[in-house]
From Swiss-Prot:
Organism of provenance: Psychrobacter arcticus (strain DSM 17307 / VKM B-2377 / 273-4)
Entry-linked PANTHER family: UPF0102 PROTEIN YRAN (PTHR34039:SF1)
GO MF entry, a single one: nucleic acid binding
Protein name, UniProt field: UPF0102 protein Psyc_1908
HAMAP family named in the record: UPF0102
Alphabetical list of Pfam families matching this protein: UPF0102
Length: 173
């Protein structure tokens, strides 16, 4: 299942290099981030959310990983989603990596998004986090766990996303 944008195109324009080819995610970290954002988008669409924007940017301010719409019977909620992935370690899990500073940045970019897309300005808003805590342990140096793509640190089947709904709030919204 692919993560499709079901509404008007709100995502940022793709920068074009001199040879008219779009810039590709080239670093391993960028590819890994894109992979987990795609997984999160597909997971949330399976839960009934509708994709509004993916990787929406406000230059010199920040980026929103996913902006989705959750339709309710009484009202709809615009959901700003931060996707995080971290290998399990003693430094804490993926959800803990969304610091107060990162939260402020996401809120600031969300304000710009709402200002630019005023048709959503009356919607209830929520800030969620999708966290992937992956495993990259090997049994030995010579053995490879075939369930794990070492380049992308793909989650094992038992590693499901942790969906933190309303993970943080925007005061004085």
């Amino acid at each position: 299942m692919m993560c499709y944008d079901n509404s008007e195109m709100l995502s940022r324009q793709i920068d074009v290099m001199a040879n008219d080819k779009p810039l590709m995610l080239t670093s391993p970290k960028q590819r890994q981030g894109g992979y987990f954002e795609q997984l999160a988008c597909e997971f949330l669409q399976e839960q009934g959310l509708i994709l509004i924007a993916k990787n929406w940017q406000r230059p010199k301010v920040g980026e929103l990983d996913l902006v989705m719409l959750e339709k309710g019977q009484a009202w709809s909620t615009l959901v700003f989603i931060e996707v995080r992935q971290r290998n399990r370690s003693h430094f804490g899990d993926a959800a803990l990596s969304v610091t107060a500073g990162k939260q402020r940045k996401i809120i600031k970019v969300a304000r710009y998004f709402l200002h630019q897309h005023q048709k959503y300005s009356d919607y209830e808003c929520r800030f969620d986090v999708i966290a992937y805590n992956t495993s990259n342990n090997k049994n030995s140096e010579n053995e490879t766990d075939i369930r794990l793509d070492n380049q992308l640190n793909q989650p094992l089947e038992k590693d499901q996303p942790e969906w933190l709904q309303g993970a943080f709030i925007a005061s004085a919204w």
